[in-house]
């Protein structure tokens, strides 16, 4: 059954609009199951109690004496409905006084808000509507208007200059209303509203103070600046605007800002934010539906076999006011394409960002054979009542790019060319083929899990998948003027204009829920050039440090204890003089480490950046068995100190063919010695050992033939957390708890010092070795049976 609604049976991307939304049963459920409705819906449907719930924002504005709890007297000629509204208004004012913060000293009380005429005006039904389809001065806008009067005191005929432009008081009030509500009202509408209110409030002292400049304000004794109060500077970001005081409901964003308690009211927003006026490319409406239609049914959402999700509320009224983009949690990782767009911008974003949150109600079984998946997505660029949008008639070559992500990792990308809109609506596709395949796979996985008894695990997995799912849609178009300019200049280039960016977040519904989709506008961050904010920092991968830079790094003080003596090389019970681990530089072993004419044992130590796969391992100077298989006798090619402490050692590309013969110690400046070039053997073991380790070292012949000379393996000196438990064994030494010092005998000067250079010395040593197979392990063709039978040497895992 699953194959009957695979992508080849998918309905076209664009379905006809739903003519009667209210007739659908699932849509009827959405009005009762959802508790988030738009502000205007609650007003128009007479939900007075719903209006009461949205008036907490008045708390910080209307601070005056409590109103007597008796019902307010009204004119007998008023309609009973108006009387009820007046009583509700009095109740709102009492609630405002009980919830308001204690900053009444910052502003005087406004008695006109309690006046009979003003309350009657507020209770009057709103008949005139604006271009956005809402009442011109709804309760929401009226509250913002009253707040704007307080924030922008009278200036007379003077202007407020900002960013090279002059603003009158009515323009500042209109801009303030737009900032706090997202709804535009013009300067003339503000002026007309002031005249209406002034017709019945004239003479009230508090009203006169807010609408007319007082004589004291014009006198020379007053030094208060003329202009909007509490206006933030252009040189500072907008913490109140992006600080999270906007919430899901329409009016919580007007609640008092916590840092501004006492005598400071909420701060005003600057004209510097990029909420600039948009008239031609503003999105006014949005519609989205996703459903499955049966084979014999019309492929329409209102006759669907199953509805995955549908739009909640009115398509022209989002459920919440505009919210700053920075309030969306982890938006840079959730929507990577938007993050790249914002980083490439040189100025403010020139299009609107819409956040859509869709809850999907999945099916428990496959649909009937021949079913079709339908997706309808409409974006309206014109206010209600308008049949033509100027921006759409001037734009063509519409495109839509869709990016789908899981935990920020892209799952799908598709580019589509859209038909030129014939109305005010644009209908971008939403990858119905991808969704059909996804729903089929999820249904299959769910049924398989139920058969195996893992129903709960499958449900949790699906829910987690949808929580991690996100999508970005970028809609672009080319204006006719831009195309003509581009063609005339001879540089076609990309002259398309970004029209909208849609951000999608998903989740799976609970068992008793219906799938709903909500939308709201997002406010992009201010321009970096204006707000002086740097771009987000990105990670930088640094190259590995070389061995030289690590060794030259100065050691922090008091990291190591004072040098303490203990035997690193045990000489048959003979005590050895102590050699400090970190002697002063002038006491270093010049015979071994001097830069000129010395025998440098560090020539074979490569730098840290030389990787293991790129170099041939170098055997130890004491390697007497070069012919042994590397997989049996090789040692780790690098030893690194633990990251938990100071860096002491970092040696790469060193292979030890016989770890029981590797006598290593830490010398001055943290050098790890000794090591030699590949294939070097020692003929006169006594002389070489005496020259390197002093007299009394065990002869090479005894080491090669005697098993008892090694005795039981003694734990080696290892560096914690780098070698692990499978460490190799050094020459015998007495165990000591400290790794900060080592003992070494004082040996006589090397007989070869000063007589010849390192190369001549090496040639002399190698040239003096005979190819005698009876050399007890020193010859190249000699095989030691004793070594083959013992387990003294094991490869480090």
From Swiss-Prot:
Transmembrane segments: none annotated. Residues 716-726 have a biased composition (Polar residues). One of its GO terms (molecular function) is DNA-binding transcription factor activity, RNA polymerase II-specific. This is Conidiophore development regulator abaA. GO terms for biological process: asexual sporulation resulting in formation of a cellular spore; autolysis; conidiophore development; conidium formation; positive regulation of asexual sporulation resulting in formation of a cellular spore; regulation of transcription by RNA polymerase II. BrlA, abaA and wetA are pivotal regulators of conidiophore development and conidium maturation. They act individually and together to regulate their own expression and that of numerous other sporulation-specific genes. Binds to the sequence 5'-CATTCY-3', where Y is a pyrimidine, making both major- and minor-groove contacts. Essential for differentiation and functionality of phialides as conidiogenous cells. Regulates autolysis and cell death. Residues 130-204 bind DNA. Induction: Highly expressed during conidiation. Expression is positively regulated by hsp90. Expression is decreased by 2',4'-Dihydroxychalcone (2',4'-DHC). Its main location: nucleus. Disruption phenotype: Results in the formation of aberrant conidiophores exhibiting reiterated cylinder-like terminal cells lacking spores and causes delayed autolysis and cell death. Reduces significantly expression of the gliotoxin biosynthetic gene cluster including gliM, gliP, gliT, and gliZ. InterPro entries: TEA/ATTS_dom (IPR000818), TEA/ATTS_sf (IPR038096), TEC1_TEAD_TF (IPR050937). The lineage of its organism: Eukaryota, Fungi, Dikarya, Ascomycota, Pezizomycotina. Residues 696-797 are annotated as: Disordered. It comes from the Eukaryota. Belongs to the TEC1 family. Keywords: Activator, Conidiation, Nucleus, Sporulation, Transcription, Transcription regulation. GO terms for cellular component: nucleus; transcription regulator complex. Pfam families: TEA. It is found in: Nucleus. SMART domains: TEA (SM00426). It comes from Aspergillus fumigatus (strain ATCC MYA-4609 / CBS 101355 / FGSC A1100 / Af293).
């Amino acid at each position: 059954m699953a194959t009957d609604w695979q992508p080849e049976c998918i309905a076209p991307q664009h379905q006809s609009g739903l003519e009667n939304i209210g007739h659908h049963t699932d849509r009827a459920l959405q009005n009762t199951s959802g508790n988030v409705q738009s502000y205007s819906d609650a007003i128009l449907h007479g939900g007075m109690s719903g209006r009461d719930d949205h008036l907490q924002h008045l708390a910080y504005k209307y601070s005056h004496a409590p109103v007597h709890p008796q019902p307010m007297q009204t004119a007998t000629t008023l309609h009973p409905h108006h009387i009820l509204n007046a009583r509700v208004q009095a109740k709102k004012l009492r609630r405002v006084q009980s919830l308001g913060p204690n900053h009444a000293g910052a502003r005087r009380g406004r008695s006109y808000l309690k006046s009979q005429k003003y309350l009657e005006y507020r209770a009057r039904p709103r008949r005139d509507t604006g271009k956005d389809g809402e009442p011109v001065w709804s309760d929401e806008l009226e509250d913002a208007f009253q707040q704007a009067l307080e924030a922008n005191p009278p200036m007379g005929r003077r202007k407020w200059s900002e960013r090279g432009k002059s603003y009158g008081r009515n323009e500042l009030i209109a801009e303030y209303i737009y900032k706090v509500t997202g709804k535009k009202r013009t300067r003339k509408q503000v002026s007309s509203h002031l005249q209406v209110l002034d017709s019945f409030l004239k003479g009230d002292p508090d009203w006169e103070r807010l609408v007319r400049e007082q004589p004291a304000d014009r006198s020379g004794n007053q030094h208060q600046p003329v202009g909007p109060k509490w206006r933030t500077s252009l040189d500072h970001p907008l913490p109140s605007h992006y600080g999270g005081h906007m919430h899901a409901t329409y009016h919580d964003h007007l609640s008092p800002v916590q840092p501004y308690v006492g005598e400071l009211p909420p701060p005003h927003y600057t004209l510097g934010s990029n909420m600039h006026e948009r008239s031609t490319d503003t999105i006014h409406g949005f519609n989205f539906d996703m459903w499955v239609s049966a084979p014999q049914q019309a492929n329409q959402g209102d006759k669907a076999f199953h509805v995955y999700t549908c739009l909640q509320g009115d398509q022209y009224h989002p459920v919440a006011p505009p919210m700053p983009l920075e309030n969306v949690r982890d938006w840079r990782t959730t929507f990577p394409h938007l993050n790249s767009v914002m980083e490439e911008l040189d100025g403010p974003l020139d299009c609107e960002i819409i956040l859509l949150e869709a809850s999907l109600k999945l099916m428990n079984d496959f649909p009937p054979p021949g079913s079709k998946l339908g997706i309808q997505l409409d974006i309206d660029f014109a206010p209600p009542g308008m049949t033509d949008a100027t921006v759409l008639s001037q734009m063509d070559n519409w495109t839509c790019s869709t990016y789908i992500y899981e935990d920020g990792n892209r799952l799908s990308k598709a580019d589509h060319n859209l038909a030129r809109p014939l109305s005010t609506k644009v209908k971008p596709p939403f990858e119905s083929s991808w969704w059909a395949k996804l729903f089929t796979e999820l249904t299959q996985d769910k049924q398989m899990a139920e058969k195996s008894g893992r129903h709960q695990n499958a449900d949790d997995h699906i829910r987690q998948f949808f929580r991690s799912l996100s999508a970005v849609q970028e809609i672009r178009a080319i204006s006719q003027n831009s195309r003509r300019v581009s063609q005339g200049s001879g540089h076609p280039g990309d002259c398309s204009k970004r029209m909208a960016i849609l951000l999608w977040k998903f989740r799976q519904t609970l068992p008793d829920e219906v799938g709903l989709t909500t939308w709201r506008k997002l406010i992009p961050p201010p321009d970096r050039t204006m707000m002086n904010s740097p771009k987000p920092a990105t990670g930088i991968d640094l190259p590995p440090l070389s061995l030289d830079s690590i060794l030259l790094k100065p050691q922090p003080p008091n990291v190591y204890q004072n040098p303490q003596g203990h035997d690193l090389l045990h000489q048959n019970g003979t005590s050895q003089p102590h050699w400090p681990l970190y002697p002063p530089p002038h006491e270093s072993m010049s015979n071994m480490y001097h830069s000129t004419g010395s025998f440098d044992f560090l020539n074979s130590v490569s730098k840290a950046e030389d990787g293991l796969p790129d170099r041939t391992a170098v055997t130890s100077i004491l390697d007497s068995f070069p012919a042994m298989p590397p997989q049996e006798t090789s040692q780790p090619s690098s030893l690194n100190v633990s990251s938990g402490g100071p860096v002491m050692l970092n040696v790469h590309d060193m292979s030890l063919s016989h770890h029981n013969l590797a006598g290593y110690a830490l010398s001055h400046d943290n050098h790890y010695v000794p090591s030699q070039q590949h294939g070097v053997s020692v003929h006169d073991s006594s002389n070489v050992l005496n020259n390197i380790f002093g007299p009394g070292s065990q002869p090479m012949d005894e080491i090669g033939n005697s098993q008892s000379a090694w005795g039981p393996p003694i734990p080696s000196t290892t560096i914690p957390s780098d070698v692990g438990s499978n460490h190799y064994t050094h020459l015998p030494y007495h165990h000591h708890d400290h790794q900060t010092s080592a003992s070494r005998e004082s040996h006589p000067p090397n007989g070869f010092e000063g007589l010849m250079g390192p190369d001549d010395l090496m040639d002399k040593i190698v040239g003096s070795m005979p190819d005698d197979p009876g050399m007890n392990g020193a010859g190249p063709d000699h095989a030691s049976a004793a070594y083959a039978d013992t387990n003294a040497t094991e490869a480090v895992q």
